[in-house]
Regions:
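Aromatic pocket-lining residues of Rossmann-like dinucleotide-binding sites
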Residues: 19
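Extreme N-terminal starter segment of soluble prokaryotic enzymes
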Residues: 1-3
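N-terminal Rossmann-fold NAD(P) dinucleotide-binding loop
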Residues: 12-13
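Glycine-rich Rossmann-fold phosphate-binding loop(s) that bind the pyrophosphate
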Residues: 8-9
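A structured beta-alpha segment of the ubiquitous adenosine-cofactor-binding alpha/beta core
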Residues: 49-70, 76-107
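Rossmann-like NAD(P)(H) cofactor-binding subdomain of soluble oxidoreductases
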Residues: 85-153
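Conserved N-terminal Rossmann-fold NAD(P) cofactor-binding segment
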Residues: 27, 33-69, 83, 306-313
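C-terminal substrate-binding/catalytic lobe of Rossmann-fold NAD(P)-dependent dehydrogenases
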Residues: 132-139, 147-313
Length: 313
C-alpha cells in the first residue's frame, strides 16, 4: 500500500514520520517543488524506520505517485506582508489548479486528502478541479476538524480523569473560529456526559464548558504564538485518516467534503461525521444537535460559503 505526500514542509514531513511511527502502509513518496528538501526529509525519516516499522520513504515527482492509494496534499504558498486572506486563497487556488490535475494524472484511483489551510475552502477547491477530470467528491477529503475533535475529547477526558478513547464528542463545521463543539452529544463509554458526572460525583458547569471551548478554539493560535506553526497534531491526524483509508476501516471521522444536502447544509465544504473507507467517504451523517448547535453549524457553513463565493471558481 502506497501513500503520496505533495508538499514536504512541516505538515507533510511530520505526516510521513507519523505514518512510519504508526506503521501505516508500505511505501511513502514525498513530492515537493524543492526536490532537495523532499530528498532530505525522506532520508531523515527513513533513518527512523529501524526504530519503528518497515516502510520505504522516498522522494520523487508526480510520476512517482503512480499506484498510490492515498495522496496527501499539504502544498501551498505562504502569506505575503500586507496580503489579504482572500488574495492568499486566490494564489493557493492557482497552486491547486496545477497540483490536483497532476496528482490525478498519475494516481487516478487515489483518494485525495487535503491538509492545506484553510482546509475547508481548499478541499472545496480541490474537489472542483478533481471534478473537471471526472473524480467524484467522495474521493476528495479534507482533514477538517479531525484534530479539533481529538483536542475536544482529550480535554474532556482530562477533566473527567477518563481515557479519551472512551469519550465520544465531535467538533463540526469550519476548521476555524466558527467551529461548533457539540456538547449535547458528548458521551463517556456510551453514557451521557451529565449522567456520567452525576454517577462519579464530578461537578461540571458552564465555566468548565467555556474553558474547554476556549482551549479547543484557541489551540492553534496558542501553539503558533510559541513556536510558529502546528504540525505534530495535524501530522498524526493525517496518519490516522490515511490508516482508515488504506485499511478500509469504515471509521467515523469528522473530515470535510463538499455537501450535497445534509441537515440543510449544501453547496459548501464543512466537517460532519463521515463514514470513511477505502474509496473515501461512504456516507455523511446528520448529527442530532440542539437548537443552538444547529444554528451555530449553519452559521459556520455560511462563513465558509461566503469565502468560496468570493473566489469565483
Amino acid at each position: 500500500m502506497k501513500t503520496g505526500i505533495v508538499g514536504s514542509g512541516f505538515v507533510g514531513a511530520t505526516a510521513a514520520y507519523a505514518l512510519v511511527m504508526r506503521g501505516v502502509g508500505r511505501r511513502v513518496v514525498l513530492v515537493d517543488q524543492n526536490r532537495a528538501r523532499a530528498e532530505s526529509e525522506a532520508d531523515d525519516i527513513q533513518h527512523a524506520v529501524p526504530f519503528a516499522h518497515p516502510l520505504e520513504i522516498t522522494a520523487g515527482d508526480y510520476a512517482d505517485l503512480a499506484g498510490c492509494n492515498v495522496v496527501v496534499v499539504s502544498a501551498g504558498v505562504g502569506q505575503k506582508p500586507g496580503e489579504t486572506r482572500l488574495e492568499l486563497l486566490g494564489r493557493n487556488a492557482q497552486v491547486f489548479k496545477q497540483v490536483i490535475p497532476n496528482v490525478l494524472k498519475y494516481a487516478p484511483r487515489a483518494v485525495l486528502l487535503i491538509a492545506t489551510n484553510p482546509v475547508d475552502v481548499m478541499t472545496h477547491i480541490a474537489a472542483h478541479y478533481a471534478d473537471e477530470v471526472g473524480v467524484p467528491s467522495s474521493r476528495v477529503i479534507g482533514s477538517g476538524t479531525t484534530l479539533d475533535t481529538a483536542r475536544f475529547r482529550s480535554l474532556i477526558g482530562r477533566r473527567l480523569m477518563v481515557d479519551s478513547q472512551h469519550i465520544h464528542a465531535y467538533v463540526l463545521g469550519e476548521h476555524g473560529d466558527s467551529e461548533v463543539l457539540t456538547w449535547s452529544q458528548v458521551t463517556v463509554g456510551g453514557i451521557p456526559l451529565t449522567e456520567f458526572c452525576t454517577g462519579r460525583e464530578i461537578s461540571i458547569c458552564e465555566d468548565d464548558y467555556a474553558a474547554i471551548d476556549e482551549k479547543v478554539r484557541r489551540a492553534a493560535y496558542h501553539i503558533i504564538e510559541g513556536k510558529g506553526a502546528t504540525y505534530y497534531g495535524i501530522g498524526s491526524a493525517i496518519a490516522r485518516i490515511v490508516e482508515v483509508i488504506l485499511q478500509d476501516e469504515r471509521s467515523l471521522l469528522t473530515v470535510c467534503s463538499p455537501m450535497k444536502d445534509v441537515v440543510g447544509i449544501k453547496d459548501v465544504t464543512v466537517s460532519l461525521p463521515n463514514l470513511v473507507g477505502g474509496e473515501g467517504i461512504i456516507q455523511t451523517f446528520s448529527p442530532i444537535l440542539n437548537e443552538g448547535e444547529t444554528s451555530a453549524l449553519h452559521a459556520s457553513a455560511q462563513v465558509v460559503r461566503s469565502v468560496i463565493a468570493e473566489l469565483k471558481l
